[in-house]
Design a protein with these regions (language model features):
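N-terminal export and membrane-targeting signals
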Residues: 3-25
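Hydrophobic core
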Residues: 24-29, 35
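Acidic, Gly/Ser/Thr-rich repeat motifs that build Ca2+-stabilized beta-propeller blades
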Residues: 33-197, 249-256, 298-328, 333-338, ...
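Blade/loop signatures of beta-propeller domains
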Residues: 33-53, 95-98, 209, 219-225, ...
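Surface-exposed loop and turn segments in beta-propeller and other repeat-based domains
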Residues: 102-116, 163-177, 216-233, 271-296, ...
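Short edge-strand/loop segments of extracellular domains
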Residues: 145, 256-261, 265-272
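Loop-centered beta-sheet repeat module
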Residues: 205-215, 222-247
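Repeated scaffold domains used in trafficking and secretory/extracellular systems
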Residues: 344-347
């Protein structure tokens, strides 16, 4: 059975799936540098957990929220996959008291969005700016009638303006559209899916099944592994999480089939195996993941954030926020953050005030939405 983006399981099914889960950690040493990582067999009532210090709801009644990016004033832009709207959620200043619900407004509609299946308005990214200034543009990844593409949108601090395509022709399908984008200084990383055609992930002439690295005009970025190519890494099935650690290393989460989901450390020009291999392999020419979740019912990792030496992975089918300790290029044993609820989780991001923001994804057609879903949560985690 193919795992696309996360079929929904009821509470009983989730407990059975987790009870049977085998969580495989790929790495040589533990964070302490003494014990070798080994497989973990978590029981449904005994999986390791991390406690919350605080959880607040900062926004409600969002429709299939997908992308999340922060502006310099601490407010957040949120893309809604199925409506094409970009919403703005007020933030909080450093040192100000945490608020629960904050003001949410609509700043515009991204033109050309054709929502359907896993496609629609997906990732959103904000470039860095000097302190005290607003960005003049933002970036968005969307599915159109013909393709997936990335656009640059003028931004005046209040609303969306002119829209300019910078990368077009990314193959689209009902499933496996990728969609996460990430700004690093003057470079934009773009995660694409294989569009349901696995062999495209190994095709260097196709933009599908890749992580791309481009400048703000969509041209191949200086220093790319292949001159004149936008491709940074290849061999991906469906990457939907991208994050940089404190040393500037790029990490990614990737959906597998029913076999294994992955947390990967991305290195320029590396091949991550799909569809030749999935999960860990001894085959030459492919780079192994740092962590795998197997079976995929325990994860379906969509969002990724890195904060204070740990990766946080938002999972759809697993309905869990996973915390994975990082030390350099090594990844430790994942633990589930005790959120006190079970919801499909789409996106997690580190906020400027040191909190984590986390979006639920119960209105995406595969969940059981409540009357005020979807929500944006603000978390402080006991690490």
């Amino acid at each position: 059975m193919t795992h696309t983006g996360g079929m929904h399981f009821g509470p009983r099914g989730r407990l059975i799936a987790i009870a049977l889960a085998v969580l495989v950690i790929v790495g040589a040493l533990s964070i302490g540098g003494v014990l070798a990582f080994g497989p973990l067999f978590p029981a449904a009532n005994a999986q390791p957990t991390v406690d919350l210090v605080s959880k607040k709801t900062v926004a409600r009644s969002l429709t299939s929220p997908w992308g999340l990016a922060f502006l310099p004033d601490g407010s957040a832009l949120v893309s809604e996959r199925d409506t094409g709207l970009v919403r703005r959620i007020a933030g909080r200043s450093n040192g100000s008291p945490a608020r629960s619900l904050t003001k949410t407004s609509t700043v515009g509609t991204v033109k050309g969005v054709r929502a359907g299946g896993e496609g629609g308005l997906l990732g959103i990214a904000v470039p860095p700016t000097p302190r005290g200034t607003q960005p003049e543009v933002i970036f968005a990844y969307l599915t159109t009638a013909r393709d997936n593409r990335v656009v640059r949108i003028d931004w005046d601090g209040r609303s969306l303006g002119r829209q300019t395509p910078i990368v077009t022709g990314i193959p689209k399908n009902t499933y496996h559209n990728g969609g996460r984008i990430l700004v690093d200084d003057d470079v934009l990383y773009i995660a694409t899916g294989d569009a349901g055609i696995p062999e495209l992930a190994q095709d260097r002439t196709s933009l599908a099944g890749k992580v791309l690295r481009v400048d703000f005009d969509g041209a191949p970025a200086a220093g790319n592994p292949l001159d004149g190519s936008r491709i940074f890494t290849l061999g991906h099935r469906n990457v939907q999480g991208l994050a940089l650690d404190a040393a500037g290393r790029l990490w990614a989460t990737e959906f597998g089939t029913s076999k294994a989901d992955e947390l990967n450390l991305l290195r320029p020009g590396r091949n991550y195996g799909w569809p030749v291999v999935e999960g860990r392999s001894s085959k030459r020419g492919f780079t192994n993941p740092k962590v795998t979740w197997s079976p995929t019912s325990t994860a379906s990792p969509s969002g990724l954030a890195i904060q204070d030496g740990a990766a946080y992975v938002a999972s759809l089918r697993g309905e869990v926020l996973w915390r994975v300790p990082l030390k350099g290029t090594r990844a430790g044993k994942p633990k589930a953050v005790d959120l006190g609820e079970q919801s499909r989780l789409r996106t997690v991001a580190a906020a400027p005030d040191g909190r984590l923001w986390l979006s639920t994804s119960n209105t995406d057609g595969r969940g059981d939405p409540g009357s005020r879903d979807d929500r944006m949560l603000s978390l402080i985690i006991n690490d």
